Amino acid sequence: MEVDPIHGENAVRPDGATAPVVDWDTIADWWRGEAAGDPVYREDVAPMLSRLMEPTTAPILDLGCGDGQWLRWLDRDVGRAIGCDRSGALLADAVATHPVALCELPSLAWLQGQTLGTAFSVFVFDLVENIDEFFAEVGRVVVRDGSLVVIINHPAFTAPGSGPFMDPDLDVFWRWGEYLERGTSLVPAGSGAVKMYHRSTGDILTSAAQAGWQLEEMIEAPLGSAAIERDPSYAGQEDIPRFLGVRWRR
């Protein structure tokens, strides 16, 4: 299950009236519409994932595969792919084309060690509370010299209290909010909301390093020009980071 990368500015603070989703199956229909209808995945996310992923003869795992959109996309370029997710309703879509497993990240107890060539996640890492366990578990199941690819909303974007503001000269700047502190926000999702966990970039890289992952490539990217043209409210944010993509080597 992924969170729409564009509508994060609609997030409310944890003391808001919207309760976080407990059963992800209740928003499965909403997610199918979001995944199919948001061109940002094709325009901005797919090129980043293509750059970070590498062909491998060992199995590839999509961590939080949802309905399997990235599993189907990967078939064009890289090797055998499987998926896991907490939503049985979305896995029912993904299983039509790929092997899948019901799981609750960060646990990968259903997998034996040294099983995968690559693991990747797209807009799922922000939903995992314990990132130390995430990096340790993925490190357990990926072979030596294997890789981990993570694409997330940029931590500058997920920090509670962050957001754009315009000065008297009409220049757009970014308010950092509580960037240096770990925190949470609730993001509207269908009739409910999901809890997103904010960590600074330094926290993320340190946690990965402590689990034995070596940083190989990191990409910071703004919202693409096509998305900004479609929604003029994003004008002035062309140089503000919106996405972070990282590849680590085991």
Ranges and model annotations:
Residues 2-56, 69-73, 90-93, 148-182:
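Conserved class I S-adenosyl-L-methionine
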Residues 117-131:
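A short SAM/SAH-binding and catalytic strip from SAM-dependent methyltransferases
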Residues 108-119:
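A short acidic, Gly/Pro-enriched loop at the edge of an enzyme's catalytic core
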Residues 61-63, 67-108:
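Class I SAM-dependent methyltransferase SAM/SAH-binding core
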Residues 132-147:
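A short glycine-rich, Lys/Arg-flanked "PGG" loop and its adjoining helix->strand segment in the class I
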Residues 207-250:
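C-terminal lobe and adjacent flexible extensions of AdoMet/dcAdoMet transferase-like proteins
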